[in-house]
Amino acid sequence: MTTVWKVLVLHGPNLNLLGQREPGIYGSLTLGEIDACLREDGVDLEAEVSTFQSNSEGQLVTAIHGALGNYHGIVFNAAAYTHTSIALRDALAAVQLPCVEVHLSNIHKRESFRHISHIAPVAIGQICGFGLNSYRLGLRALVDYLNGQADS
């Protein structure tokens, strides 16, 4: 029997404005289109994908806590909170679920304050700069990681 992995995709602040917000940086796809693509990819990867977006740091912390016992892993675009939130970092460390950090833009080619990630030290990996494919590759990497853990 094949395991169907349960994956939570979390989107941080301002990502609800995708498609309108700075399309030269973030692309023209809406968050709904990204979520639909990830759910579709999930079918092929034998992963059940759930998504959640919030502009509130506290709601994202609560979602991470709620993932414990309900999901096998997290794909997380913490957006601006990547660079500022110790609370999100600590929540991820507390639940100890494998997490892949993703970003639509290459945070390392942008302003220097964006080069710092508080999420990366508690994530299994980081993918950035590939637009929608950052999410898609992040989901695939997480499922590959989970499959590897199940095999060992």
Curated annotation (Swiss-Prot):
The active site is at Y26 (proton acceptor), H103 (proton donor). InterPro entries: DHquinase_II, DHquinase_II_CS, DHquinase_II_sf. Keywords: Amino-acid biosynthesis, Aromatic amino acid biosynthesis, Lyase. One of its GO terms (molecular function) is 3-dehydroquinate dehydratase activity. CDD domains: DHQase_II (cd00466). GO terms for biological process: amino acid biosynthetic process; aromatic amino acid family biosynthetic process; chorismate biosynthetic process; quinate catabolic process. Substrate binds at N77, H83, D90, L104, S105, R114. It catalyses: 3-dehydroquinate = 3-dehydroshikimate + H2O. The keyword Lyase applies. The keyword Lipid metabolism does not apply. The record marks R21 as: Transition state stabilizer. Pathway: Metabolic intermediate biosynthesis; chorismate biosynthesis; chorismate from D-erythrose 4-phosphate and phosphoenolpyruvate: step 3/7. It comes from the Bacteria. It is an enzyme of class 4 (lyase). Its EC number is 4.2.1.10. NCBIfam families: aroQ, PRK05395.1-2, PRK05395.1-3, PRK05395.1-4. Belongs to the type-II 3-dehydroquinase family. Catalyzes a trans-dehydration via an enolate intermediate. Homododecamer. This is 3-dehydroquinate dehydratase. It comes from Synechocystis sp. (strain ATCC 27184 / PCC 6803 / Kazusa).
